[in-house]
Structure formats: C-alpha cells, structure tokens
C-alpha cells in the first residue's frame, strides 16, 4: 500500500509551531489563545515565504533574468494568512495539525485585519497581479507606502459616513519584514545651484529637508509554484530629532520637521480640498517614487555594477498616474548621481517605463500646480521642464510646425503639469484595461499622442486572482466544479469553459442552485453576526459594491428603488418578487455629494424597514466599511451584479469579474469589461441596458437637457420629487438638483432602459432553471478574466520577458 508523500513544509510547521509558541508566549498549543496561534502561524509562513523568495530571486539573478517592478499608490491586499496557506497547499495539513488542540483554523483567520493599503479596484488589481506574477513564475516586486492608518474605517452615524483611523498594523505587522539596512534619504524643498566642471553641467540640490524611507517587505505566494512576489512598503520618518533646535526653545520648529515627515506614511489619499492636503499628496507621491527608484537602482548596481543594461534587466510599471514622478526621479539619478548625458539618460528611461491608464475622464487625469511642484521638489521640477521643452521641440519637428497640436500635447500647460501626458511621453508602452477603454484612449483621451506613436498603445484587459475569489471564497461551487470537470481549473482558469457542457443538465443546475442558497444563508449569518441586520435569503440579492462615485451611478439604482417603493406604497399587496438591494461603498472624505448618496441609501433602508408589509418584499441594506474580507463573503451569495456606469466612463472594473465567477448575472451597460463579459458568457446570459458610448457622445453633442426627462417621465419626476420631500425625515436637495439640473452622467437618460432591464432580470430569476443556466454560463466564461492570463500578456507584450 502506497504511503502518502510527506510534505517537507508541513514537517517544518509541526516542529516550529509548539517551539515558537513557547519562545514567544511561554505557552503550549493547548494553552494558546487564538490570537497567539494566529501570530505564530503567520510568523512561520512569513519565514517559509522569505526563504522561497530568496531562492526564487537568486535563480533570477543567476540566469540574468529581467525583473518587474510594479509601482502603485495602493495595494488592496486583504488578509494574507488564509491566502498564503492555500497557495502553499498547506490548508489540510495545518487543520490536521491543529485538530488535537481543538483549534479551528477558520477562527484563527478572523484575527487578521485587512491590510490598510488600498481603497478600490486600482489597489485590488495590483494585489491580484502580485499573486498572478508569483503563480506564473515572473520575478516581481510591488512598491507602495506602508500607511499607518490605511484609507479609513467607515462608520455610519445616522446614515452619514464618518471616517475613523484604520489601525491595522497591530494585527498586521507580523506580515511585514523590516529592512532598515535598505533605507533611503528623500530630499524635499531646498535650492538648486548650477556649475560647470570639466565641461559637464552639474546641478546641485542644497539646503533640502530630508525624510528617511525605511522599507518593510510583505511576501505574496504564488499557487503551486516556486514564485514569490514581494510588496515593499515604505515608512517615512525624520532623519533625527533636532535636539539643538529644541534646546534653544524652537519647540514648534523642531517638532514640525518630524510631523511633516511622519505625516507622509500616515493615511492613504488624504483630503486634498485644501493646499496642505495637496502638498501632502505630492510629498507622498514623490516619496514613493524616489524611494522605489533608488532601491531599484541600488539592487541593479549590486547585481550588475552598471546601469547601461538597466532597460534590458528591469521593467518599471506605473499603475495609474500617482507614481509618475518615478520618471523624472530616474532621470535625476542618471544625470546627477551617475553623470550620464541627457540623451543617453532619456534613452534608458524611455526603454524602462511602461504605463497603465485607468481612467477616461479628463477631470480624473492628475494635474499638479507648477508652483507647488517647484517648491516641494525643485530638482524634479527642473527636469520635468527640460523634458517638456525637448518633447515639444521634437513634436514641432515631427508635426511640421503644428503649434496648436504641440500645445495640446504639451506636458506643461495652463500652469499645470499633466502627469498622464508625461507618462505617455516617457513610456515605451501605454495600455488600457479593457478593449473599449483602450479604444477610447486612442480615439479621444490621447488621440494626438496615438497618432504620433501608435505603436505604444496596447490593451490588457484586467484580471483577478480567481483562486482567491472562487476556490477560497466559494468552496461549495469549487466542489461542484471539481465533481463535474475535474481539478485542472484550479491551475488553469481556461478549464472553466468545460463547465458549459452541463448547462442543460438539470441535476447539475439543481446542485448549482443549492450551492447559491447555502452561500446566501452563510452570508446572511455573517451579516447578522457583524451588524445585526437580517436578510431574506429567499429574495433576489441585487448587489452594487464599489467605490461611491457619481459615474458609477449608485443614484440610478436608488431611483429605481424609489420607484419600486412608490409602487408598493400605492398597493402593498401588488405582485412583487422579493428583492434585497445590497450596497457597500466608501466615499472620499471630501466628496460631499457621494456622502449624501450614502445617506440617501441608508435613509431608504430605514424607511422601508419601518414598514413591515413592504419590507417582506423590498429591502435595502448598506454594509459599512467595505473591504476585501467582506467582499469574499458577499461575492458567492450574490444573484445580480450591478455594473451600471455610464457607457464610456468605467475603464474596466474587476468586481464585475468576481461576481461573474461566482455565478451572479450582470445587469450593466456596454461599458468597461462588461462588453467582454458579454462575449465570454453569451448574449443570453447577461442583461444589458442603456446608451452605448457613441450614443452618449451624440446626445452630449446635441445638448443633453436632463430637465426634459424630469418633465416627461412620471417615474423620474416622482423619484426626484421624493428626494426633495424627504426620505426617512431627511431631504436630499443636492442630489436631486444635480440630477435635474446637470446630470453629468446621464442617469435620467438611461433610467427608463434601466427600469425595464430590472423588470426583465426579475422575470429571468423567476424561471429557476433558466436562471441557473445563465449562472452556469457566467461561471464557465469567467476563466478569461484570470490574473494569470493578464500578467502573461503584460510579460510577453509589454515587459518583454522571455
């Protein structure tokens, strides 16, 4: 009889577990608290991953392999213990090890806070890519800031969002490995001095203020591979306390220097509705870029001893415009520290950087005031000015002296530095994140740049770490898939396509419905434990969970709910398929209208809750403090996936992919990745409404007047008037006025189509086998949205890894 092969990692864990408990806490496994078990298990996993990473990167260096450095202002990592144990294929072994001590591994996971390093889709995408890069075996390091308080903890007080510090480090620091020997000095403010020496023009930066960047490493395991990615996070500190200044009585000045430095790594996206907030955000961005580029250069020099081959051995990827200052920072190092001439330095830079754009909206493309940049980072400002001068000169030559086109393409104009334009000018690749988005970039956002250098522009549709969102989050569905199509899909998402063969198998469809029901029951139990809210699991779970922004049109959803509510108020006994609308979203602290929309959702939920007869049929729930962990519970339980942004405004989305993977039916516009979801699942398995991007542009060109829709549609008028009159005792005049008078995202124009789509999706749900078949086809088509596929496309087409 064959014996089961011993897992060497498991043998090590069994040995280390009681030893570390005794060493750190002086307790045995029988005596240990769940929190102590969490810390010890986490520390063991970190050591295992650290050793794997060292071996992985040593091999990369030995073969002269190219490394990927992924710069992003945010990485929405979620919890690490469960994912790491799963990816290392240790879950069963650890559960077995803990069983004699009556320790429940699922309860241990609950002691880990979500790492407070991100906010929305941008950060979650970055986290998924670190997972995908490790799984596919590409050597990668992410760079970001170690935010002490993350984005914020959202708390609703009488429906109003309040922001509390997200104090994640006490529980999360076990995953951070300090690397103080790699600290880097970052220079702010100061003066520039120019001089010539041996016919070389030197610029010296003097009288600057120094901030010390100290790195902490977080390891990200791949699934079933030798790969381990690293997320290097920088903390900011003043170099030392100025005791002399303090002793002279200059207390405020001595403390202020420390305070400014320490503020840099306190909070993600500080409110920038005032000058101080803008200054802090700029400091954060330069701090991230200077520390990361300095570290990349130091690592490269330690291995190769030259920067001549930097672009051959290093790919630096800019995830949205926040890390754009990495471009002039690398120029600064090459010019000032290494003595390169401009042309050679620029050649290295433009072969090293690639840029992913994440927005098509002009107002969201980052711009910085010239005077602010000149004051805070004077040397970087002077380099940007020179880049712009040379870039504009080359454009004039290329475009036959077309000064108007050159002005449109200029990096500096209207006293502002356009960061996206700088990225396009300096990167060898510019990509969008869905087919539609990439076309919009070429045809409108960067049309002049596309005409100038069409070979730069590419598309890589977003992908998700599907093992986290399916295998870890939805074990019931995973088991059903394994029973029907085998286990190859665990390593290769494309294998999910084989599930489509069962779309007419009533036994499989029944099992699929059973899995969904179990997931809804489990989610309802989770919500009740967390918030006391009771969900009707026999109702449709209609889900819109994403950052709160007008372009995502949560208020379109609200208008339909108000219309349903008015219908039931008029006739409580009217036929109505029970539906629960589930919202979760954070609004930026300074975004007042978004906060009003949250308050309005909460007010509707409260008013309906107070009406027992109606609340049996219609209910609205707003879940506080949306995060990765909440999402992992919600995605498997969702029936309807609301992806209702105005066509042409959402770059791609990733929540739509996670919901599709878990069998939810998309109710959406032809925007972002919804178009590709439609292609993947089939036209009959998605519900599309609203204008297309060309129709939106045509209506805007004709002159969109929302008041006409208000005057001509009774349901629209009734919903908006209800906002004016009040919901649960609170009026929402600002939201109503924004819709009736401006409506920048054409909510009213799409409302009738949206309402009909809602009615149709409800009809589909009532036919249980039809709905299950639609759900199955979504699951089967979701493999294309794997992060493994996405990072492989980046590696082959953009980073040129072999």
Regions flagged by a language model, labelled:
Residues 1-802:
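A conserved ligand/cofactor-binding region detector
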């Amino acid at each position: 009889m064959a014996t089961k092969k011993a897992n060497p990692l498991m043998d090590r864990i069994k040995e280390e577990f009681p030893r570390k408990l005794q060493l750190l806490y002086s307790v045995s496994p029988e005596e240990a608290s769940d929190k102590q078990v969490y810390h010890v298990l986490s520390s063991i996993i970190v050591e295992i991953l650290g050793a794997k990473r060292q071996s992985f990167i040593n091999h990369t260096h030995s073969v002269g392999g190219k490394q990927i450095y992924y710069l992003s202002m945010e990485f929405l990592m979620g919890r690490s213990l469960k994912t790491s144990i799963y990816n290392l294929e240790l879950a069963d072994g650890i559960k077995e090890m803990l069983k004699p001590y009556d320790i429940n591994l699922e309860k241990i996971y609950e002691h880990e806070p979500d790492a407070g390093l991100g906010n929305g889709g941008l950060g979650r995408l970055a986290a998924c890519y670190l997972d995908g890069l490790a799984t596919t075996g590409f050597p990668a390091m992410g760079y970001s800031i170690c935010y002490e308080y993350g984005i914020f903890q959202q708390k609703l007080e009488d429906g109003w969002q309040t922001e509390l510090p997200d104090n994640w480090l006490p529980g999360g620091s076990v995953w951070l490995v300090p690397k103080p020997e790699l600290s880097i000095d970052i220079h702010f403010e100061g003066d520039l001095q120019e001089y010539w020496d041996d016919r070389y023009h030197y610029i010296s930066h003097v009288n600057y203020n120094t901030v010390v960047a100290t790195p902490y490493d977080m390891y990200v395991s791949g699934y079933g591979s030798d790969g381990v990615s690293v997320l290097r996070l920088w903390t900011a500190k003043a170099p030392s306390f100025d005791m002399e200044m303090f002793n002279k009585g200059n207390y405020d000045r001595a403390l202020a220097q420390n305070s400014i430095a320490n503020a840099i790594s306190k909070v993600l996206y500080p409110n920038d509705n005032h000058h101080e907030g803008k200054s802090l955000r700029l400091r954060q961005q330069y701090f991230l870029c200077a520390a990361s580029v300095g570290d990349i250069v130091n690592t490269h020099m330690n291995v190769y001893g030259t920067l001549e081959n930097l672009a051959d051995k290093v790919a630096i990827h800019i995830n949205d415009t926040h890390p754009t200052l990495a471009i002039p920072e690398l120029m600064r190092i090459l010019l000032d520290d290494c003595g390169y001439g401009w042309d050679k330095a620029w050649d290295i830079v433009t072969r090293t950087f690639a840029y992913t754009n994440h927005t098509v909206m002009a107002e969201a493309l980052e711009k910085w005031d010239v005077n602010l940049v000149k004051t805070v980072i004077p040397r970087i400002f002077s380099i940007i000015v020179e880049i712009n001068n040379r870039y504009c000169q080359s454009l004039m030559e290329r475009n036959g002296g077309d000064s108007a086109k050159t002005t449109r393409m200029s990096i500096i104009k209207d006293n502002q530095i356009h960061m996206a334009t700088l990225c396009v000018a300096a990167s060898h690749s510019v990509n969008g994140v869905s087919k539609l988005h990439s076309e919009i970039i070429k045809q409108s956002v960067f049309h002049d740049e596309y005409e100038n250098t069409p070979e730069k522009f590419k598309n890589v549709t977003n992908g998700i770490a599907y093992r986290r969102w399916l295998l870890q989050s939805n074990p019931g569905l995973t088991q059903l898939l394994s029973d029907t199509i085998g286990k190859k899909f665990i390593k290769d998402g494309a294998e999910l396509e084989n599930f489509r063969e069962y779309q007419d198998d009533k036994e499989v469809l029944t099992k699929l419905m059973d899995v969904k029901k179990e997931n809804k029951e489990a989610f309802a139990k989770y919500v009740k434990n967390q918030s006391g809210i009771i969900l009707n699991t026999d109702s449709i779970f209609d889900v819109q969970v994403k950052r709160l922004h007008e372009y995502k049109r949560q208020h379109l959803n609200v208008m339909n709910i108000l219309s349903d509510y008015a219908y039931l108020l008029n006739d409580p006994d009217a036929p109505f398929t029970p539906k629960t609308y589930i919202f979760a979203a954070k609004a930026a602290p300074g975004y007042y209208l978004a906060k009003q929309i949250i308050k309005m959702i909460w007010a509707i939920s409260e008013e309906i809750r107070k009406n027992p007869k109606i609340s049996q049929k219609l209910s609205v729930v707003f879940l506080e403090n949306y995060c990765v962990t909440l999402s992992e519970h919600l995605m498997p339980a969702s029936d309807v996936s609301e992806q209702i942004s105005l066509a042409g405004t959402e770059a791609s989305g990733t929540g739509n992919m996670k919901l599709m993977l878990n069998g939810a039916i998309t109710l959406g516009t032809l925007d972002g990745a919804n178009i590709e979801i439609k292609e993947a699942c089939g036209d009959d398995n998605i519900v599309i409404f609203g204008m297309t991007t060309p129709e939106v542009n045509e209506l805007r060109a004709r002159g969109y007047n929302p008041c006409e829709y208000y005057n001509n549609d009774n349901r629209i008028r009734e919903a908006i008037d209800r906002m004016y009159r009040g919901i649960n005792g609170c009026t929402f005049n600002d939201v109503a006025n924004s819709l009736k008078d401006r409506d920048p995202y054409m909510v009213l124009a799409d409302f009738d189509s949206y309402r009909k789509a809602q009615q149709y999706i409800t009809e589909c749900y009532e036919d249980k086998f039809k709905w299950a078949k639609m759900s199955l086809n979504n699951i089967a088509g979701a493999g294309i949205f794997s992060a493994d596929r996405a990072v492989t496309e980046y590696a082959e087409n953009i980073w040129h890894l072999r």
